[in-house]
Amino acid sequence: MGQIHGLSPTPIPKAPRGLSTHHWLNFLQAAYRLQPRPSDFDFQQLRRFLKLALKTPIWLNPIDYSLLASLIPKGYPGRVVEIINILVKNQVSPSAPAAPVPTPICPTTTPPPPPPPSPEAHVPPPYVEPTTTQCFPILHPPGAPSAHRPWQMKDLQAIKQEVSSSALGSPQFMQTLRLAVQQFDPTAKDLQDLLQYLCSSLVVSLHHQQLNTLITEAETRGMTGYNPMAGPLRMQANNPAQQGLRREYQNLWLAAFSTLPGNTRDPSWAAILQGLEEPYCAFVERLNVALDNGLPEGTPKEPILRSLAYSNANKECQKILQARGHTNSPLGEMLRTCQAWTPKDKTKVLVVQPRRPPPTQPCFRCGKVGHWSRDCTQPRPPPGPCPLCQDPSHWKRDCPQLKPPQEEGEPLLLDLPSTSGTTEEKNSLRGEI
């Protein structure tokens, strides 16, 4: 306990351009379950494959990971196949299939051999649950007792950067924290440090009150491995050897975020409008990401997304949806309806204001008819008499008193020799040469 190791986890990789953050977190959560841990090359190949898969229409609705696994080419480098296989298993696990009914086999007959696998089918290898885990700040080296490594500043900065654009308690906020807890396996003291680094003092106080309530209920209910004589749950969860109790405390720490008050400002997703030339699919994707970042966890997103997909669309898409009767249809129907819509090419015409006829009244400046006062060529008269000479006919800058007087006896030009004599001298010089 308290031993500091030099090995530190790499920062959370960035999502490829065009992929939603909540989708990327699902892939990261599956990648960190691999043993040994994925390398930078594995993440690079995963990003490369997802960039190619983004061109397919599987991102419009909840992703079918089985369909995504069929898009992986044979012999694709990295561990992309294992990551997709984990997601396929998690997607199928909620609806467990019924147990197969055993068929009676006659003792005299031999069971038919299984058909050979087709060489053309590309089936990902089965996922094998790792026997040992290597998480941080709790280190689990094989064949040695668990040890604790405190938070490093770059770990906290990486987590804060991921949740900076998400609202408190939103699905993306909670999914990022779950991924960080799964990757680092923090103790109770580490979780308290993380909370103080991410949230304000008010949120820390409210979270602490809710966490104490949940811990009291859990201690009363009873937990596997919990010994009331060994101290409170928070103290036992700080022990690196008590992995089960630490997991229970981590789940309670995450559950305490569900009752925190949200942001009282107007939600940002309510002001998202479709641009005049923006594709409808891109507009719905922006709405989807904004709802993931702004809605509290557990709030149904589908009705709000359908309502905003029609009310915040531009007028042309609203007319198309209204004509087809898809104002409150499933999101897939609305996307297919507006899929072929393209903005019309509107020719920009320069509107020139016609010239008004000349006025019939005389100009206020010169008294003539036929032009406006702003077009008059007559200089503007001074507002009053000159402050120097009291003459009302000129401005101060034109006052003759400001000009220096000239002497009458001094000639303006010097006496120059006559041009005839100069010409004769030049001709004589040319003749001598």
UniProtKB/Swiss-Prot annotation:
Protein origin, superkingdom: Viruses
SUPFAM superfamilies, per the entry: Retroviral matrix proteins (SSF47836), Retrovirus capsid dimerization domain-like (SSF47353), Retrovirus capsid protein, N-terminal core domain (SSF47943), Retrovirus zinc finger-like domains (SSF57756)
UniProt short sequence motif PPXY motif, positions renumbered to this chain: 124-127
Miscellaneous: HTLV-1 lineages are divided in four clades, A (Cosmopolitan), B (Central African group), C (Melanesian group) and D (New Central African group).
InterPro entries listed in its UniProt record: D_retro_matrix (IPR003139), Gag_p24_C (IPR045345), Primate_lentivir_Gag_pol-like (IPR050195), Retrov_capsid_C (IPR008916), Retrov_capsid_N (IPR008919), Retrovr_matrix (IPR010999), Znf_CCHC (IPR001878), Znf_CCHC_sf (IPR036875)
Annotated organism of origin: Human T-cell leukemia virus 2 (HTLV-2)
Protein name: Gag polyprotein
Compositional bias annotation for Pro residues: 97-121
Keywords of this entry: Capsid protein, Host-virus interaction, Lipoprotein, Metal-binding, Myristate, Repeat, Ubl conjugation, Viral nucleoprotein, Virion, Zinc, Zinc-finger
Cleavage, annotated site positions: F136, P137, L350, V351
UniProt short sequence motif PTAP/PSAP motif, positions renumbered to this chain: 94-97
Residues anchoring lipid (N-myristoyl glycine): G2
Coiled coil stretches, renumbered: none
Record-level Gene Ontology MF annotations: nucleic acid binding; structural molecule activity; zinc ion binding
PROSITE patterns registered for this protein in UniProt: ZF_CCHC
Annotated spans, Disordered: 94-121, 397-433
GO BP terms: viral translational frameshifting
Keyword Metal-binding included in the entry's annotation: yes
Annotated Gene Ontology cellular component terms: viral nucleocapsid
Alphabetized Pfam families for the sequence: Gag_p19, Gag_p24, Gag_p24_C, zf-CCHC
Keyword Cytoplasm: no
Organismal lineage: Viruses, Riboviria, Pararnavirae, Artverviricota, Revtraviricetes
Zinc finger intervals, CCHC-type: 361-378, 384-401
PANTHER family in the cross-refs: ENDOGENOUS RETROVIRUS GROUP K MEMBER 24 GAG POLYPROTEIN-RELATED, IGE-BINDING PROTEIN
Ranges of biased composition (kind: Basic and acidic residues): 423-433
